[in-house]
Amino acid sequence: MSGDEMIFDPTMSKKKKKKKKPFMLDEEGDTQTEETQPSETKEVEPEPTEDKDLEADEEDTRKKDASDDLDDLNFFNQKKKKKKTKKIFDIDEAEEGVKDLKIESDVQEPTEPEDDLDIMLGNKKKKKKNVKFPDEDEILEKDEALEDEDNKKDDGISFSNQTGPAWAGSERDYTYEELLNRVFNIMREKNPDMVAGEKRKFVMKPPQVVRVGTKKTSFVNFTDICKLLHRQPKHLLAFLLAELGTSGSIDGNNQLVIKGRFQQKQIENVLRRYIKEYVTCHTCRSPDTILQKDTRLYFLQCETCHSRCSAASIKTGFQAVTGKRAQLRAKAN
């Protein structure tokens, strides 16, 4: 019974725990227990060994669990520390890089602007010193030239040594460009409308066409158009009948009666061709012209540019228009 009392004695277990707590760190419980325990353990040798073995196993398991927990904690702490060290390392590098950049910029900033300012100031000073007087002279000359041009525009007077063309007073031949300039200058002098750039349009009343019966058409305002064009009715009548390929006459109401059915557009086209050939000038396109007949030929004389050119004679009778038909067929194909 003394052995059982020793096994279940709570004081002994407490003492054993207190004795073995400092040995947990050294992990040498077996050797130290044999040295530290006195003669009390020698009295009960067989039975307490089993209890000690059980307690030692329990303590070993506890130590292993504690060591595993410590290892896990150390592992996590190492990981956390590594992460922290990495972050700190990155921040330090960034700060060092920023400091380096700041140092470089501080070193470079005072040098470059000073050089640039020195260069710019030097150039400006040189320009001001060297170009002061020529600039003023050029400005004065430009102002005087502008004033002279304004006076020329107002007065219309130009001063020049040339009294005639460029080749006058010399033995050289004139050039093609000089002749062209002379021609255009004369045209501008004679026709001031061309200088302004306004193209004069010829306005004419539209022809009034009325059907008479089933086989005839009446050109009502024939005489009015002849007066607008300043042409004789006989000449315009001959051209109309030749172009339309019909016969007709003027009745008592001064209306042109034509055989056949014709529309207003057809007569307008004929009148356009007549105006282009026998009314407008071929050089300046002015309608102020006079049609004259000389030795079986008609001549068109312009009153604005005073040019004179021949006009085609009116051909009467049947004429084959094979050329026009061939052109139309070629275009269609």
UniProtKB/Swiss-Prot annotation:
* Organism from which the protein derives: Pongo abelii
Kindly state which keywords UniProt assigns to this record, in alphabetical order. Answer: Acetylation, Cytoplasm, Initiation factor, Isopeptide bond, Metal-binding, Phosphoprotein, Protein biosynthesis, Ubl conjugation, Zinc, Zinc-finger
Residues where N-acetylserine is found: 2
Q: What is this protein called?
A: Eukaryotic translation initiation factor 2 subunit 2
State a single Pfam family of this protein: eIF-5_eIF-2B
For whether the record's keyword set contains Zinc-finger, the answer is yes
Tell me the protein family, please.
Answer: Belongs to the eIF-2-beta/eIF-5 family.
- Biased composition, class Acidic residues, residue ranges: 106-118, 139-149
From the UniProt record, which GO molecular function terms apply? Answer: mRNA binding; translation initiation factor activity; translation initiation factor binding; zinc ion binding
Mostly located where?
cytoplasm
